[in-house]
Swiss-Prot record:
Pfam families: ATP-synt_D
Functional summary from the UniProt entry: Component of the A-type ATP synthase that produces ATP from ADP in the presence of a proton gradient across the membrane.
An individual GO BP term: proton motive force-driven plasma membrane ATP synthesis
Subcellular localization, as worded in the UniProt entry: Cell membrane
Protein name as catalogued: A-type ATP synthase subunit D
Organism: Pyrococcus furiosus (strain ATCC 43587 / DSM 3638 / JCM 8422 / Vc1)
Quaternary context: Has multiple subunits with at least A(3), B(3), C, D, E, F, H, I and proteolipid K(x).
């Protein structure tokens, strides 16, 4: 017989197990629904991440081309001096949000694109090519932060999907079948005991009737 639980083969245990099977099957159904919903959410975000990554690659290319043109116009040494004098960006704030019980990051990205006057370098010593390059890299930074949020969300959702899948499989292939096998075993055991009791009572009745007829 397949593997069973170590319980006493009594009617009380039989009733308990039947209740446990119902609860386990309900839990399995809910977990399966959660798993399916998580997978749908994962692929929705995955498509978004792919689109953002393609856009980021494009923007990085544009930014480095703008940087090359700025170098040609003002020279590498002057460009480095300008870069050192740039004001730092605003700080980002990382919070979290809930997606079907999974905590994922929520990054509050401030407006990173700035006016030339907000960057901190003197107009007289720079050029429009430098402004364009700075703007392009600000766009890259903003998109990279958004992509980091999305990819971390994917990572956490993926872990939760695997965790939920293991629980679904454990219930479906181990726990519920084991309980059902145990129920079957107890029912067979109780039926056998009833048959033995029936034949025992029948023999006792026959003996009593034989004595009365003597």
């Amino acid at each position: 017989m397949p593997e069973i639980l170590k319980v006493k083969p009594t009617r009380m245990e039989l009733l308990k197990l039947k209740r446990r099977v119902k609860l386990a099957e309900r839990g399995h159904k809910l977990l399966k629904e959660k798993q399916d919903a998580l997978i749908m959410e994962f692929f929705t975000i995955y498509d978004e991440a792919l689109s953002m990554r393609r856009e980021l690659i494009k923007k990085i290319g544009e930014a480095f081309e703008a940087l090359r043109l700025a170098q040609v116009e003002v020279g590498s040494v002057r460009l480095k001096e300008i870069a050192i004098g740039v004001n730092p960006n605003k700080e980002i704030e990382v919070r979290s949000r809930n997606i079907m019980g999974v905590r994922v990051p929520l990054i509050e990205v401030p407006e990173l694109k700035r006016k030339p006057s907000e960057r901190g370098y003197a107009f007289i010593s720079t050029s429009s090519a430098v402004d364009v390059a700075a703007e392009k890299f600000e766009e890259v930074l903003e998109l990279a932060i958004r992509l980091a949020e999305v990819e971390e969300s994917l990572k956490r959702l993926g872990k939760e999907i695997e965790k939920t899948k293991r629980r679904v499989n454990a219930l479906e292939y181990i726990i519920i079948p084991r309980m059902k096998n145990t129920i079957k075993f107890i029912e067979q055991h109780l039926d056998e005991m009833e048959r033995e009791n029936f034949f025992r009572l029948k023999r006792i009745k026959a003996l009593l009737e034989a004595r009365e007829s003597m």
